[in-house]
Amino acid sequence: MSEKEGMSEVLEDTISQFRKESRSQSMKEPGFIKETSNLINEASDYLEGKSSNQIYETHPRQNTLESTSSSGRKSKRNEEQKKNLQFSETSTRTGTSQSLSSLTGRTAEYQALVNFLSHETVGEVSPQVSEENQKQLGLGADNFTVNLEAKGLQEFPKDILKIKYVKYLYLDKNQIKTFQGADSGDLLGLEILSLQENGLSSLPSEIQLLHNLRILNVSHNHISHIPKEISQLGNIRQLFFYNNYIENFPSDLECLGNLEILSLGKNKLRHIPDTLPSLKTLRVLNLEYNQLTTFPKALCFLPKLISLDLTGNLISSLPKEIRELKNLETLLMDHNKLTFLAVEIFQLLKIKELQLADNKLEVISHKIENFRELRILILDKNLLKNIPEKISCCAMLECLSLSDNKLTELPKYIHKLNNLRKLHVNRNNMVKITDCISHLNNICSLEFSGNIITDVPIEIKNCQKIIKIELSYNKIMYFPLGLCALDSLYYLSVNGNYISEIPVDISFSKQLLHLELSENKLLIFSEHFCSLINLKYLDLGKNQIKKIPASISNMISLHVLILCCNKFETFPRELCTLENLQVLDLSENQLQKISSDICNLKGIQKLNFSSNQFIHFPIELCQLQSLEQLNISQIKGRKLTRLPGELSNMTQLKELDISNNAIREIPRNIGELRNLVSLHAYNNQISYLPPSLLSLNDLQQLNLSGNNLTALPSAIYNIFSLKEINFDDNPLLRPPVEICKGKQLYTIARYLQRADERDEKILEKIFKIVANNITETNFEFLCQKLNLANSETDMPTKSTVSLSERAHQALVIWKTQSNKLSLTAAALRDQLIRALTMIGAYEIMDKITALNLFTRAIKF
């Protein structure tokens, strides 16, 4: 997660209530259905944290309350809301007298069963549970849940089928490829079966035996066909086949008279059968990301349908029959090919959410005034030049997103949308923000980035509920004073404008948490910023700032400070007073050294000093034991030639980027950085990798492309954590360049292992050549060159032991000593050849050269 995303998450906490209210009224998911069905109402309970028995289907539908312009800063919570299609089932049944509190009271009893079935060895030893054992475990007439998610199961645990009282069975995220062998008496009470993410290729015909099944989830598998026997599941209410390989819509589903929710999103459907209207109870239908080229008319005759998702298809028009969807509340058709909207769509008087982003719409009809219940309208990424004034009749509208169109102005009467909370008009041709926007008393999020706006009306100060404002990349000359009067404003971005001065009024915005002013015309770090004692994130990058005021010490909450691409020539010591600072970016300045006071930044985690003018590596950085990420690459700055051994003091370092320098070697103690996960050292002059590099057991990314490496260490395959490697653009001989091109560690490791074996054999042959051909005089000279003492080579029976044997024994001793230095067989060979050359053993050299030529000609 980036720092911006982290701050956005803080802001999302503030507006979570708004989102929750908006979503609960928008009818986007089955949980928002305001009907009497317990099944549907439970999903709504889930969103409020009430439901106790749920399973989830993951899918990539977009969050309807987030503009595409802010997608880069969505919080994790929003990502989950984008992906989840909730489905739930009530644990209270007609005729069941047990209350929820009673069930909770018996948790300890049935937890024994869950623990027993969830044992680590369950994949190897199937549990045998007799009726007597079931009683001992407390299995009675209760609604028991068995959760075996991610237990490494290779096959369906058949013995579970014999347990009478299991009602909810979760087997997600295993490796169950199929399940068969059920008998007519098995799992008679099973109501929920979830087999997501297992690699299932099909469903067995025995599925029909699960007569009481109400929810079946087999999403994220490899299923290409739905068996006809599924039509026998008369009690089924929810079916989830999301993200499979289904090409034909299962016609047998028409027999499922109680089906309420059907998810077939992300399959390969091209056609919907005309028999679909037989599903008269269907309320929620997901067909997103299929291959539909037309809007299936059969969908228009589902009388109870309230939510329809056709996102990501190839639909170019809507049929007139769409008017028959009288109860439809949510229609999602983002990422299609729509060029116009059939006028009949405006007869859907109950519509509450309409998403049409990323189409080719040029006009919206004035009949939009019919949508009196509309809460959410998403029209991003179309070709709209104007929005009809009649949109002001959509009095319930809460979210209006119009980004990435061709709008020059807002609708005249937009101020009548009293319930509007989000207005996003990014990347259009807006020249100004109309004064009447000040009447939007409930507005919380306002985004106008990427337009040609020159100023912001002072009247915006009346919008006292605004939390977030985006005005980046416009033509604003002066900091908008009206923004300084917004007491609820937490997030403000005015990047990419022409602001040169900061007014004193900003010092009153003490509630600000996140402020972005990069790419403006600021010459100084204004002291008015220093009054923002709650500010956590400040981006002043790409300005012309040269120094920092001493009063910055007042910014006690500051966690992230971006000062890249400014005019700093010396490191601002004033920054060292920011005890809570976690992220500092001073890249692309003119820094030559760093103050030793930087050690006062006790909580610093991320530093970016790339593209500066350091003469040497700033050794002061090595004091920062809390540092996790360091970037000192110099693509634009002065090149570093060496790294200090003290680098190993940064014991918490996880990411190190030393790329684009002139570094010749990696410190020999690099292995002491035990937490290192990512090492980027590309485009340097490194010719050798120290053995301690192989001690980095957590290393996942290693980029050494563009260096002078001729060989890789044989034991590199021992770094089991490595996931990404890059040795491109090195003069590699061992292994050859073509072996490394695929960036596959297994391939490289296999080559090196075989090369090691080959080098050992060659070295032994060289030993024999030397031993069989060396003279007594040359042998003595060779021992001297190899630093072998006479005591190591003299033998008590020298007169009876041949010169050949003594020479071979000496070479073995030399090899044993050299192995302590972690020298490879190839390195030993090269040393021996140099020594033979120095003593003038040319005849032996000729024989070794012939051997080398012969072995290179043989592929292994």
Swiss-Prot record:
Q: Positions of the region Disordered?
A: 1-103
Q: Does the keyword NAD apply?
A: no
Q: Which organism is it from?
A: Homo sapiens
Tagged with keyword Repeat: yes
Q: Identify the SMART domains for this entry.
A: LRR_BAC, LRR_SD22, LRR_TYP
Q: Polar residues bias located where? A: 50-72
* GO BP term (any one): signal transduction
Q: Which GO terms describe its cellular component?
A: cytoplasm
The protein's name in its UniProt record: Leucine-rich repeat and death domain-containing protein 1
Every copy of the Death domain together lies at 764-852
The gene is LRRD1
An example of a Pfam family matching this protein is LRR_8
Q: Where is the composition biased (Low complexity)?
A: 90-103
